[in-house]
Amino acid sequence: MRKRIVHLRGLALAQVPATEAPGVLPGKQQNDIPILEDAYLDWSDGVITGFGTMSELARLESEGYGLGEAPEEVLDGTGRWVLPGFVDSHTHAVFAAPREQEFALRIKGATYQEIAASGGGILNSARALAAKSETQLVDEALPRLEALMRTGTTAIEIKSGYGLSLDSERKMLRVVAELKKHSPLDVRSTYLGLHAVPTDFAGGKAAYTEAALNHWLPRLV
């Protein structure tokens, strides 16, 4: 379906001229994002087919230049903005329980190592995750993805790492795979088996690293 949104307060562009490949704008250069004011945007079946300012649109129409077939639906974008989708490349969107109490400890000066030594941190998250079913984890994660989407995120990476065992890491990755089926976001997964070392793992850090890399990883890919 051909659609057009008109009178946008702002249309943020990835690059000018738009024919160039998007580049990276680091640091203060991020203040120089090109923006079209009082703009329009055309799209059809999820693909952008045209954009520009309303004055450009009026000029083209008055001069008889065709912009393709007329839109089947015109939306009023007064006061609204259109931005390129955000890519959130580092998230832990799948988890079983928040750790806000640890945040209070950090504010009071506790180090992460001190929190972990008392049973908190990643090990606390791993225990909570092991106790929940995949269905529960999916049901709890979907609203988080919906909240991200409402604020402009269109692609998201989700890490495992709160499993710390083959079964739980596999469970987390299965949850991410299920989220891909139910969310319109572009969802990618990362195996983070070395997020922390379980205190009860026989052989300690060296043995855990060996297991996570050489035994678990081949069974998860």
Language-model segments: residues:
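N-terminal metal-binding scaffold of metallo-dependent hydrolase/deaminase domains
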Residues: 1-65
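Conserved beta-strand scaffold positions in the cores of enzyme catalytic domains, especially
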Residues: 5-7, 13, 72-76, 189
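Metal-coordinating catalytic core of metallo-dependent amide/deamination hydrolases
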Residues: 125-140, 146, 154-221
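Divalent metal-coordination and catalytic microenvironments
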Residues: 41, 46, 79, 90, ...
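Intrinsically disordered, low-complexity coil segments
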Residues: 21-23, 58-75, 202-203, 209-210
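Metal-associated gating/positioning segment near the N- to mid-region
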Residues: 65-140
